Curated annotation (Swiss-Prot):
Ig-like V-type domain ranges (all copies): 25-125, 128-217
Keyword Transcription regulation listed: no
Organism name: Rattus norvegicus (Rat)
Similarity comment: family membership: Belongs to the immunoglobulin superfamily.
Note: It may be a useful marker for injured podocytes in puromycin amino-nucleoside nephropathy (PAN) since its expression at the apical surface is altered.
Name listed for the protein in its UniProt record: Immunoglobulin superfamily member 5
Length: 369
């Protein structure tokens, strides 16, 4: 009985010693963050003081590797260990082989009976593929063309650039996500080649010194003879816009000139018609004035010194005839009577001559004021 109690007491003492001794161990330096490429290896180091009894490695909260002073305890072939001793510390290394995307997460290093832990984070990146629709491109010399490079299956999305081994007069490129597919990025190269060469699309990982490239051949041919000076010499966009604006302004100017010309013609015709009508009116007025002089007299003043011919004739007729006055027969006698007088013998008397002064010719003067 006493022997059994002694054995139990010895075990308790040993456990107490392990607990006390284990609690005095420390982690000097924990693991550091690692970014690894899918399919590669990831290494984590944990530095502790001497005298340790048990070191445990956990990934995403699951212990994948344990290490005692005698040997490591391995739960998976993807996880192995290495160790390094120094004068004042011990370094334990956990190696993760063939890293997968789902391995991304926290990594923990801990000691038995210790509340001190070392933490790090594992980031896994995936290198996808590059694709250019044609590996041999044939373009026309001096004509703009574009080449598209597709990056598919990259995590995270890469940075895409171009390497040109061909003489060009102009080159530029831009990248963007494919609409409807956030895991596919496109890069478009615009260039104007002048000779043969190669084009290389390069995709680089953001946090790793890793890249993928794809090269295509570019063959430049001469433009066909019928296109020289024609389609091959197409005007730039700014020149086409300038010509369109110039033609529009010219058309507007022509329309305005036509409108002005028509207005001038109509105005001139109306003026000629108005002048012609005025001339007609003047001619009519002149004719009317000649035919009806009373209209002229109405515009003048009355001459009170004027006497009519009838009044003078009546005054002269009332005077008695003077002696020795000879009167001629009136001209109003008929022609037969005159013939008879010619055949009759006339008495021998002195001829008598009379002058009709009753109606001398008068000139009527009108004074117009």
């Amino acid at each position: 009985m006493e022997g059994s109690w002694r054995d139990v007491l010895a075990v308790l003492v040993i456990l107490a010693q392990l607990t006390v001794s284990g609690s005095s161990y420390q982690i000097i330096e924990g693991p550091r963050n690692v970014t690894a490429l899918k399919g590669s290896e990831a290494r984590f180091n944990c530095t502790v003081t001497h005298g340790w009894k048990l070191i445990m490695w956990a990934l995403n909260g699951i212990v994948e590797l344990s290490l005692t002073s005698q040997k490591p305890i391995i739960t998976s072939n993807r996880f192995t260990s290495a160790s390094y001793n120094s004068t004042d510390s011990f370094i334990s290394e956990m190696i993760i082989h063939n890293v997968q995307l789902n391995d991304s997460g926290p990594v923990q290093c801990s000691l038995q009976n210790s509340n001190v832990f070392g933490f790090a984070f594992l980031s896994v990146q995936v290198m996808g593929t590059l694709n250019i629709p044609s590996s041999n491109l044939i373009v026309t010399e001096g004509e703009p063309c574009n080449v598209t490079c597709y990056a598919v299956g990259w995590t995270p999305l890469p940075n895409i650039s171009w390497e040109l081994e061909v003489p060009v007069s102009h080159s530029s490129y831009y990248s963007f996500l494919e609409p409807g597919n956030s895991l596919r990025v496109l890069s478009v190269l615009d260039l104007t080649p002048l000779g043969n060469g190669t084009l290389t699309c390069v995709a680089e990982m953001k946090d790793l010194q890793a890249s993928e490239s794809l090269t295509v051949n570019l063959t430049v041919v001469q433009p066909p003879p019928d296109s020289i000076g024609g389609e091959g010499q197409a005007l730039p966009t700014w020149a086409i816009i300038l010509l369109a604006v110039a033609f529009s302004l010219l058309l507007i100017l022509i329309i305005a000139l036509i409108i002005i010309f028509c207005c001038c013609c109509v105005s001139r015709r109306e003026k000629e018609e108005s002048t012609y009508q005025n001339e007609i009116r003047k001619s009519a007025n002149v004719r009317t004035g000649k035919a009806d002089p009373e209209t002229w007299l109405k515009s003048g003043k009355e001459n009170y010194g004027y006497k009519s011919d009838e009044a003078r004739a009546a005054q002269i007729a009332s005077l008695p005839p003077k002696s020795g006055e000879v009167s001629l027969p009136e001209q109003r006698s008929s022609l037969p009577q005159q013939e008879l007088d010619k055949h009759r013998p006339s008495p021998v008397t002195h001829p008598r001559v009379s002058f009709d002064i009753a109606s001398p010719q008068k000139i009527r003067n009108v004074t117009i004021v």
